[in-house]
Amino acid sequence: YLYDHACERKGGEKALKALLPKTKSKAHLKKLGSDRYLAEFTRKIFQSGFVWRVVDKKWPQFEEVFWEFDVERLLMMPDDMLERKAKDPAIIRNFSKVKTVRENAMMIDDTERREQQSFGECVAAWPNDDMIGLWLYLKKHGSRLGGNTGPFALRTLGVDTFLLTQDVEGFLRSHDIVDSGITSQRALKAAQTYFNDLREQSG
């Protein structure tokens, strides 16, 4: 029913499929370097509340300014260099967002040290029936990865996670699956349970 509803909302099955990001295998997610996770987190942070195409157009410059998101190199970046990068006209000059690059590099490094495996392996090992657990981990330990920012980044990277878009939230509310704030623990658990049931039903 949800799939039929989505097709109707988006103008047919073909149009819907064109909008859906391709999910990747666990093997792919394991091999994906920590630099790519950090890059996508950063991209989504800058796209949040901003014109996406402007970020996309400047993205090659972001890669250059932040050393292709080399985590180890970014960890050693001193404060004065971070401030200079935040003023670089080649990127979008927003210091509070630029700071997240080093902060999320620290989160990735801390995760790898604690778990004794790569960040990609940690993401790939996360249970599919607890995606909200991964969302909450990123929100708690990362910087500006709450709301839909972290989940959108994961989905773009190929993680098989649902997203609480306005359409999805509207559907969940209209079917009395969610009746509280969408970011509340209660709502997240209800949404996760619903999508787990859908996964089981679809095989």
Where are the predicted features?
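Short, amphipathic alpha-helical segments that act as regulatory/interfacial helices
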Residues: 42, 46, 59-63, 102-109, ...
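Short helix-capping/linker segments at secondary-structure and domain boundaries
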Residues: 48-54, 108-116, 177-178
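Short acidic/histidine-centered micro-motifs embedded in hydrophobic/aromatic stretches
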Residues: 58-61, 77, 104, 156, ...
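N-terminal polyanion-binding entry modules of DNA glycosylases/AP lyases
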Residues: 1-94, 98
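Alpha-helical ds-nucleic-acid-binding substructure associated with the helix-hairpin-helix region
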Residues: 67-144
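C-terminal accessory module of base-excision DNA glycosylases/AP lyases that mediates lesion recognition
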Residues: 1-22, 116, 120-203
